[in-house]
Amino acid sequence: LVTVATPNSTHYEISKAFLEAGINVLCEKPMTVTEAEAEDLVLTARRTGTICAVNYGYTGYALVRHMRAMVARGDIGKVRLVVAEFAHGHHANAADADNPRVRWRYDPAQAGVSAQFADCGIHALHMASFVSGQNARELSADFISAIESRKLEDDAMVNVRMDGGTTVRLWTS
């Protein structure tokens, strides 16, 4: 097993090479920066008999698994709305622009089309999907950046309609 925890734009090439070599891959999110690359990794894993997984650690927590079981049993009724927030002060300072460990996260060529949502907000959306047993069907998003020089968002508000009818309202910053 190899873990890929590098800038997002490198995930596809690195993961593909290991899968082709018959080695299972645990990839940091996002799996890739394009849908076509992600689909290719799925097909490569199937063809080579390997596993290509994305690291969403929160769904391993006992409390999250307990919530999922409660929802599946109907203990709390139909889930109509999930409100999730994933807030932190990480990268809140404009001085972070000089930090090479931070800089790539706001560079579309390395991070892809999203920064904050792809890095943190996706955890909340994944938990909502995991707990509700529903998948995202459609979404609308408002991405802004408090630090104007950034090319990608450091604040995101996302509304998601799940395939079972649940609405997810998510904020991350």
What feature does the model see in each segment?
Residues 81, 157-159, 169:
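Conserved hydrophobic/aromatic beta-strand scaffold that supports enzyme active sites
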Residues 26, 51-53, 83, 140, ...:
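Structural detector of well-ordered beta-strand residues that form the stable sheet scaffold
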Residues 58-142, 146-150:
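Predominantly a Rossmann-like dinucleotide-binding segment in NAD(P)-dependent oxidoreductases
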Residues 1, 7-8, 12-59, 74:
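Beta-strand-loop-alpha-helix segment that lines the small-molecule cofactor/substrate pocket
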Residues 23, 50-51, 80, 164-166:
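Short, well-ordered coil/turn segments that N-cap beta-strands
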Residues 6-7, 172:
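Short glycine-/small-residue-rich Rossmann-like dinucleotide-binding loops
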Residues 146-153, 163-173:
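NAD(P)-dinucleotide binding in Rossmann-like oxidoreductases
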